[in-house]
């Protein structure tokens, strides 16, 4: 089985899952080529699992304009069984090559179907995304195959690395600093919780605004901006609570990653978490934008060790039962082998 991926993402949960899947497929004997942007920090994580070719994805770059022709020529030469595009914009560049099964993998809600004119099958990582694709009028094949993450526990980072007292309650969140991630709401929540520290991993266009908000609310001494981290697991293992504060989150890989490290989760009632989280059982859920609600939920977990343990254990059970590496990899292998 030979698969050629084209993935033009930058850094984030979708990219971490891409790395996980490429490695899992390689372990099961799939020969892979990955076309990615230059300079990706996660390139080294797939170097042993796939041949890597780099291509620019800027809208007006010559590489982007020529990419469909390059992929088609490469496909004729190397004869992959499957071409797999990750996300709508990569799907738009899918060549009209008849010799391979053409798959588009979606981790978010598409706005139109014209991206997928040369796609045979759309893989959606939640039922909600699949429903959107169907509602838009898609008549070809749809599969729902979700994500997985590594479940191995790691050694927690020393809190002193982020200038945080060893005995302080610590809350963490991570992702690109954009408005929809809701980090401003989380900072407002922490301002209501004296003594609680907040670690934010990531970066982005809202960075300066978030720094200013922390200063304006008088909590800059308790908020740590840690930037992008190659491995977030030691940080997840070191904190008391992980908070997913997004107003829009199709799945929520960060929740799965938190459960893998035994960390309880508080999440907004956004799309993905509402699918697999059960309020009060495997996590606590809060309305979008409700800083006071986040503060109450965080305080509950910090103050109640038995609740913290129970939420973490039930979360890990959900991870293993619904998002296992073996089951997700099996589902992809079954799909890849179903080439018409």
UniProtKB/Swiss-Prot annotation:
- Coiled coil location: none
A family per Pfam = Glycos_transf_1
Keywords noted in UniProt: Glycosyltransferase, Lipopolysaccharide biosynthesis, Transferase
Enzyme class, first EC level, given as a word: transferase
Q: Which GO terms describe its molecular function?
A: glycosyltransferase activity
Annotated GO biological processes are: lipopolysaccharide core region biosynthetic process
Membrane spanning stretches: none
The annotated pathway is: Bacterial outer membrane biogenesis; LPS core biosynthesis
Query: Which Gene3D superfamilies does the entry link to?
Result: Glycogen Phosphorylase B (3.40.50.2000)
Q: Give the EC number.
A: 2.4.-.-
Hey, which family's this protein in? Belongs to the glycosyltransferase group 1 family. Glycosyltransferase 4 subfamily.
Full protein name? Lipopolysaccharide core biosynthesis glycosyltransferase LpsE
Which species is the source of this protein? Rhizobium meliloti (strain 1021)
Q: What is the lineage of its organism?
A: Bacteria, Pseudomonadati, Pseudomonadota, Alphaproteobacteria, Hyphomicrobiales
